[in-house]
UniProtKB/Swiss-Prot annotation:
Residues 232-262 are annotated as: Disordered. It comes from Schizosaccharomyces pombe (strain 972 / ATCC 24843). Its main location: cytoplasm. Residues 234-243 have a biased composition (Polar residues). The keyword Nucleus applies. GO terms for cellular component: cytoplasm; cytosol; nucleus. The lineage of its organism: Eukaryota, Fungi, Dikarya, Ascomycota, Taphrinomycotina. Keywords: Cytoplasm, Nucleus. This is Uncharacterized protein C21D10.08c. It is found in: Cytoplasm; Nucleus.
Amino acid sequence: MSNVEQPFMQGIDDGWNLKNYLNIQSTSLCLDKLCNIYTQGQDENEDAKELQAIKIKIEWCKDTSVLLSSICVMLLDSIHDFLVQQGKITKESISKRDYSHEITIFNFKYAQQEMQNEKLYHFAKLLEPALESLKVTNNHITHATIVGQVSGSEHNLSTAIEQVDVIVNYFYDSSEKFLELGNKVQTLGKAKNKKHWLGVYQSFGKASVDQIQKQLECYNVRMMELNKTDENNESAICESQASSKEDERSDKTTSSSKKKSFTKLISNSRLNLWNKQ
């Protein structure tokens, strides 16, 4: 078994726990492998549109994975900091090898119960299914990659499209759960005594909620454009080019902001620790 395949198999053996499924690079690699598995052996001339659809969907899944995983890591980091401030866990615990997000969530559940804070209770209630949805999504991707590599067989086109649609639905469902969570976080920020959970609010602010909403809309736009006729596609490209000039400055600002956020995220010591384990 190759060095690349070993972490995938280990992930399944370990129950694909939280510290594994937040590895953005591993998920992206799995999606690239799946794209190759699902498109190999297909007729590029007769099935050009269908193959393009598969590639577009996989690319959308990769973008969504980075977005949700990044928000997830920053959100859980802020919860950890909140627990440190409340004296529920020590700063030294972060250096222990057995530290994981499960411990953070476990302590957070007990902390909010002790505080008897209704807003934190509802937040924790929405947090669990959001995290679980991302866990299930990446678990499915990893398992599909292992099966595809082990079998080594080519998929017929209809099966490939069906498998990709399943992954898209997983990410779509996960995005909606994070949207619901993000809206709840906004209510936390509006509380009178918000000092104790201000970090949680800032880590999942309105900008992140808007990004998820935009990502969901982006999928629909991409698929609509793919289904247009050649004539309509040419018209859409012209309109897109015109609007891109108008939004160029805004896009550069957004791109710069994302780059800084992700650079900060990837360099985070806790994230590096989880990815190495």
